[in-house]
């Protein structure tokens, strides 16, 4: 369901939000000292290039397909922070001709879950560019993505004077227990994960930032049935024409200035939107959940989510008789989970 637009912030609230934005920008600026350049190819960035910014840890399984996927869509350069990976992530990325790589051993949680580092890269290199801010387990689809690349999409958004594209994060899962089998590096994750929950999803517009809050779907159904308000936030603004004066507040779920949050109103909205296919539940999910639980670097209160990690370790079956097999963007548009907005 789509969210109604909340009333904008009053004068005092607007002033406080400006101060908050400046504090976030200052945090991002300071965080540059935590990043060590490993491979800098940013000199090749040309006007009009589409950039992708991400923070990763131990993503050697997903990265080969991820990089090829976004290259095909038209991404010119990837700006990546490697947060102390222990697998082949760093050498894999350093060998790519279109990747600029930084490394850090600093705390992911203390850096606002990597957002300070990503925000610095956006500030330094993204100004004036259409930029994607993504995790390695997110594949963006949008109307006509099988025939029109990101250049075509962003050109159309520019003509509409729309600075961002919103998206629903849609969890994909297997029909059997999670964590079973194996996935080869470079394999299409949709060969393993091809089911999803078509709903229900609910959307709420929050004051004073006018940010959207979408929840629902399979993780709420399976892991948070008694505490639905603790379930994951599913709305994002993953594609945006960046301005160095802007600041993401909570991942790319919300942003300042507040009016940018109105670019997306959730499932059922009429404005152009996409879907982030979330490939979290590949066979490595149980091992990753155990590591995340031990490292305590996710969630503001990691201890309160111990039950969530324990449930993943039990390798549950997420599939239900209401699950749908994923068929493509037209299917999701027909279900109201994305909109072409007249494109």
Task: Give residue spans per PLM region.
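N-proximal low-complexity "stem/linker" segments adjacent to membrane-targeting elements
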Residues: 2-68
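Short loop/turn motifs at secondary-structure junctions
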Residues: 74-75, 127, 135, 161
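Short beta-strand/loop segment that forms part of the nucleotide-sugar
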Residues: 76-84
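Catalytic-site signature of metal-activated, phosphate-bearing donor transferases
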Residues: 2-29, 114, 144-343
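An acidic- and aromatic-residue-enriched active-site/binding cleft used to recognize and process polar
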Residues: 57, 83-86, 96-98, 104-107, ...
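Active-site-proximal specificity loops/subdomain of glycosyltransferases
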Residues: 88-133, 141-147
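Short, acidic, metal-binding catalytic loop of nucleotide-sugar glycosyltransferases
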Residues: 68-76
